[in-house]
């Protein structure tokens, strides 16, 4: 029942998000035809407004937009006029999902072991070194890490391509740029979860029963210590997708982040609203999946 209620709640929530995005994007100064290569005459501008129904009242435009959404149509792009929003999403979303997925796996693969090691070696060199490394990557934004990686690994050493997206080698530097920050966040969450779990009574009981330290750490402590990371996974995936805006622009990757930035700057109303709705759906679905995974890992949790 809990999951059915969550799914049923999606519809009114998406209506609210669509209305807010549709209204707010039109409050921004400027219009979708202000940055034409050649300044449009008043007659041409009026014709363009009429063609895309932008001369109608906002409430009427919104109802027309909802009618298209019901049919799976996000409308035409006002900047990329030979393409619809649906076409552009179909083109860019797989690229952004691939980049975000690889960065997610990288962040988990680095952050969880690093947090585990620092917690188990609390007060030792491993703890201090790992904690410093996690804090360091958190403090350096992708806008700084990206150019550094390009200059060192691409321009100086020629190990990886500078930009674009076409082979596995093209994905290495963008994945590192996007995933390093989140690996530090996960490491800190894992360390805190592990330290809290190691002080629990059931861990003391397990040790008193004569279980080996390896069994205590991996069979009993790890399963509960990783729960904060699981809870963070939903927002993490959403952050990776939105954080890819910067990375995609640095490395000129043809994902939806590039389209989102360009559409926002050019007041491409339909594109902006369509991408906002897309990210909202992804966030809602990911949070629901995280709740389900959390209940599987911790049997004490029951959603009703």
Task: Name the predicted role of every residue range.
Residues 1, 89, 93-126, 165-304:
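Alpha-helical transmembrane segments of integral membrane proteins
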Residues 1-9, 113-149, 250:
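Cytoplasmic-entry segments and transmembrane alpha-helices of multi-pass inner-membrane transporters
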Residues 13, 17, 21, 142, ...:
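Alpha-helical transmembrane segments of multipass membrane proteins
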Residues 13-64, 79, 154-173:
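Hydrophobic alpha-helical transmembrane segments of membrane transport/permease proteins
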Residues 28, 137-140, 241:
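Transmembrane helix irregularities
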Residues 50-58, 75-82, 186, 262-270:
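Membrane-interfacial helix-loop-helix junctions in multi-pass membrane proteins
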Residues 55-112:
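An internal, D/E-rich "acidic patch" concept
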């Amino acid at each position: 029942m809990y999951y059915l209620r969550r799914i049923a709640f999606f519809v009114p929530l998406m209506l609210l998000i669509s209305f807010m995005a549709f209204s707010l994007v039109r409050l921004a100064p400027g219009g979708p035809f202000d940055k034409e290569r050649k300044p449009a005459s008043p007659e041409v501008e009026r014709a363009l407004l009429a063609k895309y129904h932008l001369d109608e009242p906002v409430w009427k435009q919104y109802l027309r937009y909802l009618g298209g959404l019901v049919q799976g149509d996000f409308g035409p792009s006002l900047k990329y006029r030979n393409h619809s929003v649906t076409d552009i999403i179909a083109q860019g979303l797989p690229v952004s999902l691939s980049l975000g997925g690889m960065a997610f796996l990288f962040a988990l693969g680095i952050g969880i072991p690093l947090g585990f090691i620092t917690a188990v070696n609390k007060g030792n060199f491993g703890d201090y070194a790992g904690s410093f490394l996690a804090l360091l990557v958190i403090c350096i934004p992708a806008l700084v890490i990206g150019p550094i990686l390009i200059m060192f690994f691409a321009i100086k050493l020629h190990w990886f391509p500078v930009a674009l997206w076409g082979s596995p080698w093209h994905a290495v530097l963008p994945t590192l740029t996007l995933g390093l920050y989140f690996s530090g966040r996960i490491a800190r969450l894992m360390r805190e979860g592990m330290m809290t779990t190691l002080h629990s009574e059931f861990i003391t009981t397990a040790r008193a029963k004569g279980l080996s330290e390896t069994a205590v750490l991996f069979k009993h402590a790890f399963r509960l210590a990783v729960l904060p990371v699981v809870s963070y996974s939903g927002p993490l995936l959403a952050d990776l997708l939105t954080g890819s805006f910067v990375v995609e622009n640095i490395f000129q990757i043809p994902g939806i982040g590039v389209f989102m930035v360009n559409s926002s700057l050019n007041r491409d109303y339909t594109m902006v609203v369509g991408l906002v709705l897309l990210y909202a759906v992804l966030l809602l679905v990911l949070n629901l999946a995280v709740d389900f995974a959390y209940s599987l890992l911790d049997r004490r949790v029951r959603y009703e």
